[in-house]
Amino acid sequence: MITIKKGLELPIAGGPEQVIHNGPAIRHVATLGEEYIGLRPTMKIKVGDKVQKGQVLFEDKKNLGVKYTALASGTILEINRGARRVLQSVVIAVEGDDSVAFAQYDADKLDTLDAQVVRDNLIDSGLWTALRTRPFSKVPAVDATAAGIFVTAIDTQPLAADPVVVIAQHKEDFANGLKVLARLTEGKVYLCKAQGADIPAANAQVQEFAGKHPAGLAGTHIHHVLPASATRTVWHIGYQDVIAFGQLFTQGVLNTERVVAIGGPKAKKPRLVRTVLGASMAELTADETVGDGVRVISGSVLSGRTAVGPQAYLGRYHQQVSVLEEGDEKELFGWAMPGVDKFSITRSFLGHLSPSRLFNMTTSTGGSDRAMVPIGNYERVMPLDILPTMLLRDLLSGDFDGAVRLGALELDEEDLALCTFVCPGKYDYGSYLRDCLDTIEREG
């Protein structure tokens, strides 16, 4: 077992009840183009077309052969594009339950399936996009290989669902999904889970993690078990997608069900909700928030994105919905107040005198932008064997060669989310990291 000692358990109010409830009926779903880094789509549909669940919507010009399929049957309602014609979302008005039938196999034969057969079925169904690479956090090429595949079956994000609760309802499908994954690599499949978690391992190698967040991030697991580099690529996948893999191969259907945690200080009844991938956030959170001036976030409060406009839909890789108050009110002389109701990692406020207290946090950054100030905050929350202050400095200054030498290729935006949270300078280090990774990949 690997214990993570550095990190942060964010004391935020609104933790969800770990019981799964049925969510509201979803009338609109969307595939979000900007979630797929570097995507240049070749559209196979147009507005007004009728589609079946699992039908191809578009393919990627830059990653030939990768297919993106419909998350529900219905009618193409919108194809939204942003600046420079970047695809933002393809919205489907849900109608009926027509679905494309895919190849299915006996569960006891999954261990012996031909690797190319497995790839073809995943690609045709669109589930290939559930896999992501390190370095670069992109959907792998259809002919790519991985030194190992990591299954993230532990979640330490604030307000997250317990994977054990979700997997308990699909243990056989999860085990079958692990068998499918094993056919994709000559290396090992690593099942990363919490200490003592009751999760079937099938033929995967179990690696247990304990400790503070980010003990549940794929980047943490990869760094400690099989580090990625310019010469070694590994893949990772979420536990609910592993369940979908198992159902695809044994039932021949594309399962787009997703259990998400709805939580946060402004959530009316924090709990786990069964919904679908790409669900409209307006429909999913209807009657779920308290009061006005609320921000709905797809994903974690640390690394999620605001669900608004053409992107107001549940993200492909997100397993929670966070609800916070918009922190747009300024507090006169707030810096001089005792702050008994405020949290600070540096113990600047008296809130630290109540270590078990949960805080009604808002979206406020607690001040304006300023210079980067290295006072030890980054080292407190970074459990990886890197020099965070030096790495972040190189990212801000544009010294990407230096950033790579310090370990940038191992990281994703979510791995630097805690550094962003504790930064006195209010920098979003994730965006600087993405600029670095894009530049390194482009220039080789």
UniProtKB/Swiss-Prot annotation:
An annotated Gene Ontology molecular function? oxidoreductase activity, acting on NAD(P)H, quinone or similar compound as acceptor
Catalytic activity, as annotated: a ubiquinone + n Na(+)(in) + NADH + H(+) = a ubiquinol + n Na(+)(out) + NAD(+)
GO process annotations (BP): sodium ion transport
What does the record give as EC number?
7.2.1.1
Disulfide feature = none
Keywords recorded for this protein, A-Z:
Ion transport, NAD, Sodium, Sodium transport, Translocase, Transport, Ubiquinone
This protein's source sits in the domain of life called Bacteria
The UniProt record lists the keyword Transport: yes
Q: What start and end residues bound the annotated signal peptide?
A: none
Oligomeric state and interaction partners are given as: Composed of six subunits; NqrA, NqrB, NqrC, NqrD, NqrE and NqrF.
Protein's job = NQR complex catalyzes the reduction of ubiquinone-1 to ubiquinol by two successive reactions, coupled with the transport of Na(+) ions from the cytoplasm to the periplasm. NqrA to NqrE are probably involved in the second step, the conversion of ubisemiquinone to ubiquinol.
The family annotation for this protein states: Belongs to the NqrA family.
Name the chain's protein: Na(+)-translocating NADH-quinone reductase subunit A
Natural source organism: Shewanella frigidimarina (strain NCIMB 400)
Q: The organism's lineage?
A: Bacteria, Pseudomonadati, Pseudomonadota, Gammaproteobacteria, Alteromonadales
